[in-house]
Amino acid sequence: MKRTYQPSKIKRKRTHGFRARMATVGGCKVLARRRSKGRLQLTV
């Protein structure tokens, strides 16, 4: 049985990256929350 986490930089960026977040309403809300909280790193 293989492990569930198979790291891939491309997949990581495409699903959790900044542009992926900006593409949806929910993603924009995520970024807004993280900005208001003062996170230094908004996305991956």
Curated annotation (Swiss-Prot):
It holds the Pfam family Ribosomal_L34. Gene3D superfamilies: 1.10.287.3980. GO terms for cellular component: ribonucleoprotein complex; ribosome. GO terms for molecular function: structural constituent of ribosome. Transmembrane segments: none annotated. GO terms for biological process: translation. Keywords: Ribonucleoprotein, Ribosomal protein. InterPro entries: Ribosomal_bL34 (IPR000271), Ribosomal_bL34_CS (IPR020939). The keyword Transcription does not apply. PANTHER family: LARGE RIBOSOMAL SUBUNIT PROTEIN BL34M (PTHR14503:SF4), MITOCHONDRIAL RIBOSOMAL PROTEIN 34 FAMILY MEMBER (PTHR14503). Belongs to the bacterial ribosomal protein bL34 family. NCBIfam families: rpmH_bact. This is Large ribosomal subunit protein bL34. The lineage of its organism: Bacteria, Bacillati, Mycoplasmatota, Mollicutes, Acholeplasmatales.
